[in-house]
Amino acid sequence: CLTDSVTRACDALGPDHPDTLASRNSLAGAYRDAGRLDKAIALYEQNLEDSIRVLGTDHPSTLTSRFNLASAYRAAGRLEEAIPLYEQVVAGRSRVLGPDHRSTLTARDDLAATYWEAGRLDEAITLKKQILADAMRIMGPDSPGASTARLNLAATYRDAGRLDEAVNVHQQ
């Protein structure tokens, strides 16, 4: 049981040990997966606060904690709380891991999707255009990643009522 694992880690290693933080993050993920978003969010919030204090703002584990909290906020429909966290994750992962790292690209894609869900279509389009250009550069224009990015951009243009641009993206 994950709650036992967190308790054991806390007792053996202390509440601020990186393994204890990782165990708490896993427990929060289990709560999220079980649909218990309130418990997940509370645990993610505490874990992020502790990770920043113990590991620092740009530590990869802290960036993961921030990403997980943003994802939980998004799942709970708390989009305006998720967006600044995703923006911080994108900036941090770009600095720490590089702009082309898979984790950075994942965060950018989730940020773009959250912009879209929040009705911030212009911001979603701008970011999705960058994602498509990067996917074509990194993976190749005919790669599955570029195809997915192309479809996502076209759908966002469609939702924004920019149908000619949606068709043009599909025809690329």
Q: Predicted segments — roles?
A:
Residues 1-172:
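Intrinsic-disorder-linked linear interaction elements in eukaryotic regulatory proteins
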